Regions:
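Glycoside hydrolase catalytic-domain context in secreted enzymes
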Residues: 1-485
């Protein structure tokens, strides 16, 4: 499943305990008149089918014991103990019915058994999955799908299928009074949050943006991270390590990777300390650090960046950039820039790609000339949330477009030393949180024996493995062994 990074683990009890505290922390306490925030429990329920067919997967023949002891306890705890205000229904089907149209899940279990009286909203596009050809195909059209979803208790849709509710009422597929039930829940929530009143009347609007990533919050996060770590084994009392003449080897594909620590559906932190950086900082002046990546995530290969072999037509290092405040590149660019390092652009946190460029509804074109100093296979590595295309010598060699978070895309080219290659990368984005990472490099096979030789004198080896958001993300296209995306 593409969003495993966001979960609290597979243990129903621990997930329940952590989830309840997160909900309480998010929602806070009512100030006497207004709620601070409404948290949402997701995705309800049995949402752990294969990523690649999530829009048509049917979770069936679930034994009652599995349902009530494995899949449902965290949701029940969030409703009964956490008093969560919202629940999101999942993409998949449950026992034949789409979760957002399941009376069993939304009416019998959630509302009748647990007493939930808040809002149920759909995952984005989930109602359209009822009738789309590449979805469940349980309903013939948007009118039937939207009527069924509302009647099953889905009050709010992330999407546009509910626009058909007017016609559904006219066709007699649903009574207007049933729609009124959902509308009442939605308006009740908005009144509770103070959305219908002047901002100055709502105490929560006085919280300044400056608290985000503030020194106090950073300190608390660090303290929480330290106190929440669990040491499972300490064979021969290896820990704590003693400084002074210590040689530490740090290995693994995630050792020097910031993105690995962010998860997915993440904000962009103002700074990140990689595990390699953290160990380096912790060592004393008499200690020695050896960094040897040693392997990739799933392949016996590493990418050695050759971004420094790229120059623009006028001889400047890196890529020239042109930006438009529209997605069609109409008119003259609003600004130009020179990008001298591998791309790490993201609009999260209201950070623009360049001064004067929109946060949404913008496009960009990057150009450079790549002149390799050796022959071999060069990988053009793209990780993007948005749409675009890569051209080499005027020919489009790779296109990309995605709707949910970052997507990894790559193109491999056999190059000759001294030959020039015109590189052009287009990018455009309509919504918020645009993301574009780009680099190029030679793909070198990992020689495990050489890596072992380089770290043989280390007193201890710290290996940092696991997966990464570069491998695992929602509806993320992955072209690597062992992953179907």
């Amino acid at each position: 499943w593409g969003r495993g990074i966001e979960t609290y683990g597979e243990d129903p009890y621990l997930t329940s305990r952590m989830g309840v505290m997160v909900v309480k922390g998010l929602q806070g306490t009512n100030d006497g008149k207004y709620d601070k925030l409404h948290a949402c429990a997701k995705h309800f329920a049995v949402h752990s089918g294969p990523e690649w067919n999530r829009h048509e997967f049917n979770a069936e023949n679930i034994k009652p014991r599995d349902l009530y002891e494995t899949y449902l306890p965290p949701f029940e705890a969030l409703v009964k103990e956490g008093k969560v205000k919202e629940v999101m229904c999942a993409y998949n089907r449950f026992e034949g019915d789409p979760c957002c149209g399941s009376d069993r899940l939304l009416m019998q279990i959630l509302r009748d058994e647990w007493g939930f009286d808040g809002i149920v909203l759909s995952d984005c596009g989930a109602i359209a999955d009822f009738y789309r050809d590449n979805g469940h195909k349980t309903h013939p059209d948007a009118e039937s799908a939207s009527a069924a979803a509302v009647l099953s208790g889905t009050d709010l849709e992330c999407g546009s299928s509910y626009e058909a509710l007017v016609e559904a009422v006219k066709q007699g597929k649903i009574d207007e009074k049933a729609v009124d039930v959902a509308v009442k829940r939605l308006l009740t929530a908005r009144f509770a949050l103070g959305e219908m009143d002047e901002p100055e009347k709502v105490s929560w609007t006085g919280i300044p943006f400056s608290v985000v990533a503030s020194a106090g919050h950073d300190s608390l996060a660090l303290d929480m991270a330290r106190k929440s770590m669990t040491l499972l084994m300490n064979k021969d009392n290896t820990l704590p390590l003693k400084r002074g003449g210590l040689t530490v080897a740090v290995m693994g594909p995630n050792a020097n990777d910031s993105v690995m620590q962010w998860g997915n559906y993440n904000g962009m932190p103002p700074h990140t300390v990689t595990i390699l950086d953290g160990i380096r900082k912790a060592l004393g002046t008499d200690d020695r650090l050896i960094y040897e990546q040693g392997c990739g995530w799933v392949e016996r290969a590493q990418i050695q960046s050759v971004f420094n072999r790229c120059k623009t037509a006028d001889g400047k290092p890196g890529f020239s950039a042109r930006y438009w405040n529209n997605v069609t590149r109409d008119g003259e660019p609003v600004t130009t820039a020179q990008v001298t390092t591998p791309f790490h652009f993201c609009t999260s946190g209201a950070t623009v790609f360049a001064p004067g460029v929109n946060l949404t509804d913008f496009s960009a074109t990057y150009n450079s000339v790549f002149t390799p100093d050796q022959s071999g296979e060069v990988v053009f590595d793209i990780y993007a949330y948005g749409s675009g295309r890569l051209r080499i010598n005027g020919e489009e060699v790779r296109g990309f477009s995605n709707q949910h978070g970052g997507q990894k895309s790559a193109y491999t080219l056999q190059v000759q030393a001294g030959k020039t290659y015109d590189v052009e990368l287009d990018f455009e984005y309509f919504r918020s949180d645009a993301l574009l990472n780009f680099d190029l490099g030679f793909k070198n096979e990992v020689d495990v024996r050489k890596s072992v030789e380089r770290v043989k004198d280390a007193d201890i080896v710290v290996f940092v493995g696991g997966v990464s958001p570069n491998l695992e993300g929602e509806e993320m296209g992955v072209e690597l062994p062992g992953f179907r995306g």
